[in-house]
Amino acid sequence: MKLIKHICLQLILCLLALIAQQSIFAQAYNAEAFLPPPSGPYKIGTKEIYLTDSSRHEKYSWSKKYRKMSVKIWYPSDYTPELGYDCYMATYSTKIIFDIFKPLGVKKSFLDSTRHFKTHSVCNAPLSTKQDKFPVIIFSSGYYFGIPDLNSCIMENLASNGYIVCSLTHPYEQPYVAFPDGKKIYLKKGRTRLAFLQLLIADWVRPKDKSTVEKREAITRNTLKRLKKFDKALKLWVDDSEFFVKTLIDNCAKNDTFFCKIDTSRIGALGHSFGGAVAGQLCKNDPRVKAGINIDCFQFGNVIDNPLTSPFMLIESSTYIDWNIGNEIIYSKSNADFYKLSILNSSHFIFSDASVIPFSNPKNVTDFNGKANGRKTINATNNFVLHFFDYYLNHDSKSKKLLEDKFSNSEMIFDYKLKQ
């Protein structure tokens, strides 16, 4: 009898141990990155820097203080895994993210759960010593919704392939930025929403007849004239970006231990949503920026009358058909190599981490990504972004060959027009 009790006790203990072990494995799995594994040979480090432009006063402040900004940087590293990976969205409270994305039906409890996931990056890991210099990409995310970490998929992939990627935060017109002195700047919701109101009015009064190129161009020009709020924001963000380019060059000249590793002869511009329009205008304004990519934004600004002279790529969703038509008019005037990747049946946020975030509600997947496959889309986006910059910044002949293959299928269309 005692033997039977002993055996039963051992079985119970084994069962409890197995359950505990499964629980530990589950917790470990939940802490793993949902972000796709970066494709490059480098490990990834992150750091944040804070800058003040003493040549410009802050337009959103009555106190005439100088314009301040923060920059999150992803970069190639040779760290060891023991350093521990960054948590996803670690510097943003759930409340801030929820307040911005609540209209899209995302639950606060779900946002809380994403914070247990890890990225593939390590905060303040040492910069890689495997190259003397690395090319740099200047990135901006979206107006109103823009959070640098929400584009970690693209940032990490570029950094793992030897790029230093600098994501600028534009205070007052993006959700949140905190400075080392304790100052916190939040989105000016009322003022920023006026830009969207102008957009709604422009859509409402837009002529419906788009039957000819001339009519489509007239519609595009009329839309650009009506979007004054976005034009003002574009100038502010481009000024931020040009100030950052100057900062990079100045710090390189001072032999800063981090910035002296940046090759300022190989600068690219990249942006998602409104940041994509910033990339286009920055390429036009600043000859130090050698190539750029607009991910899913209408090209605000004066590019329509001042065609691009730098290689450029447009990656577009199916969300804003009129924007796509307008971009076709604007970029058709380009005086440099131009590429376009169209993702069919997709929504605007499919180019962000929303493409792979493990949403618990299937409706969220459709709202953010459309009907397109999120993981396949972000992988394709990463592939084209990388090959584009590899060719135009690193002069890699293999990437050139990959960019020469036009294709069209039920999911994507890739086309280009090369300068003769």
Name these PLM-found stretches.
Residues 1-28:
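Bacterial Sec-dependent N-terminal signal peptides
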Residues 290-351:
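The feature captures the conserved acid-bearing segment of alpha/beta-hydrolase catalytic domains
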Residues 179-261:
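Alpha/beta-hydrolase active-site loop
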Residues 243-307:
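Primarily recognizes the serine-hydrolase "nucleophile elbow" in alpha/beta-hydrolase
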Residues 78-96, 172-177, 339-358:
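Short, solvent-exposed beta-strand-terminating loops
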Residues 28-36, 41, 45-46, 54-55, ...:
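Alpha/beta-hydrolase-fold serine-hydrolase catalytic core, especially in secreted/extracellular enzymes
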Residues 27-137, 370-371:
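Domain-level recognition of soluble alpha/beta enzyme cores
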Residues 120-134, 139-178, 320-322:
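Short substrate-entry loop that stabilizes the transition state in hydrolases
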